[in-house]
């Protein structure tokens, strides 16, 4: 990569507090050849700004991995604001809903894959892949989706189309090439991933765009002009000398490779049928034969089929057990990886491979999929480690994995604002609701915000309803809310649309909310994952960006985890107090700009009520004469279906899906 300064950090702020020494140590360690480091940064010390400075010093492509979509979105917004002239991309799962293919042997129930793709997030994924191949100044903020298989990097590169003015290119040849790149010709519904032909003009909407199209103007067999144009009104925006057009699918492949892949699938099918027949599993042999032959016919005819990802090993011509191609391959050999909230993200990465292994094994054993489907998987942890180059584990509470590696730990405890860690109060659970209400009213008088964390979803729902009845502007942040909607809710909290946010496990790591002056932890003394020392330290830290920040633990005793969390908080607080006294500085309020959320507008309401209940058998559907009532019922069932899929209750999810389809047949959902 060029040594010129590609990354240009733009900010009115200068490193302060503990940031200068942390930046210097981290950069020097990398220059000395160290590959891994820990940045132990207390909440609110500006770890993201420190990382931005590291990126500017190292001048390398950077992958930032967050453990949930909310944090990924927040990091994306912050880094995009700091690097306005560089490419900052967003790569998360594009599924709004995903129910995997499954077979439940106990009831002999096969459940087809069912999913809903968010087109706008898919667009952002394509933009990330294209930027990594086209530029050196790229930062990608990703969820663990980055360790899941995408198309082969070499195939994607070979499928890239370069066009420039003056090129000799027959119009029909370009049409054929676009179809090979998975673009669909559509003269009526012109949208992302399609093209249309108007005389000597071909218009394309690339996979990484939506509002800006590409217009190729021919004069005979020569490209006379290339333009960007506004898809809405058709007006030309700029004339271009050349363009690079990436495939409409990340799973692009060429015809020759596809044919070789089909041969390999046929050979494996033959071997699997022989296996089933030898073991007297004739029904399984018949099922795998019918399914695979149908898929092969579709692959031969149109180059695609339902569940094509299950044949990815063959279509990429990989060997059994070989690591899948992922977004990480698009970074090349020299790049920086930031693992945000590493104490949560590392265990998440470790667990991805095992998550659905048994589900796929069932599909293979009972004749629904070929054994090669097992290679349609995320990276194993050792494969992920092998792909890393320079790594910073970023956390206020590093996990055991990082701490046992015996790598440098760089501490960042002093905040640029010189604000101290919150004071902690322990209060009894008796009359805790009345006490909490009093605290909320006190904080809202001072235009401050409140976070409340509970142990269960039911308790969060009940508490939200209770506070609403008391006229508190409260929102409930729960797992069913879509990733981009969560960012809107957090933004609305900062803007004052809500005074209070209630949640279970979504109010811990990384939420940057300087307006929050109070964190209330209910059932703080209960033992378990949600109340271990790391969780408590992280939760307390949500109030660490506010001068008057404090945490209230409602508990009837002090658990060992509480004791550790309290001691660590006060250890940091003491260091901060001593620094402030020595340097004669005074804590100041943080006036943090409220950034726009990711450039995708949510049409749905930011708050949805949770629906609970079980589906018992084939429940008879009520007739809905009112369209609004019918739509509400469908949405209610969709929520229940998603929840069932999340808990791997595939039978319940399939039953709900059938009920939804039956309702939709009686009238289109608006």
Swiss-Prot record:
A motif (Beta-hairpin) lies at residues 94-117. The keyword Protein biosynthesis does not apply. ATP binds at residues 41-48. Keywords: ATP-binding, Cytoplasm, DNA damage, DNA excision, DNA repair, Excision nuclease, Nucleotide-binding, SOS response. Residues 432-594 form the Helicase C-terminal domain. GO terms for cellular component: cytoplasm; excinuclease repair complex. Residues 631-666 form the UVR domain. InterPro entries: Helicase/UvrB_N, Helicase_ATP-bd, Helicase_C-like, P-loop_NTPase, UVR_dom, UVR_dom_sf, UvrB, UvrB_inter. Residues 28-414 form the Helicase ATP-binding domain. It is found in: Cytoplasm. Its main location: cytoplasm. SMART domains: DEXDc, HELICc. The keyword DNA damage applies. It holds the Pfam family UVR. GO terms for biological process: nucleotide-excision repair; SOS response. GO terms for molecular function: ATP binding; ATP hydrolysis activity; DNA binding; excinuclease ABC activity. Belongs to the UvrB family. HAMAP family: UvrB. The beta-hairpin motif is involved in DNA binding. The UvrABC repair system catalyzes the recognition and processing of DNA lesions. A damage recognition complex composed of 2 UvrA and 2 UvrB subunits scans DNA for abnormalities. Upon binding of the UvrA(2)B(2) complex to a putative damaged site, the DNA wraps around one UvrB monomer. DNA wrap is dependent on ATP binding by UvrB and probably causes local melting of the DNA helix, facilitating insertion of UvrB beta-hairpin between the DNA strands. Then UvrB probes one DNA strand for the presence of a lesion. Forms a heterotetramer with UvrA during the search for lesions. Interacts with UvrC in an incision complex. This is UvrABC system protein B.
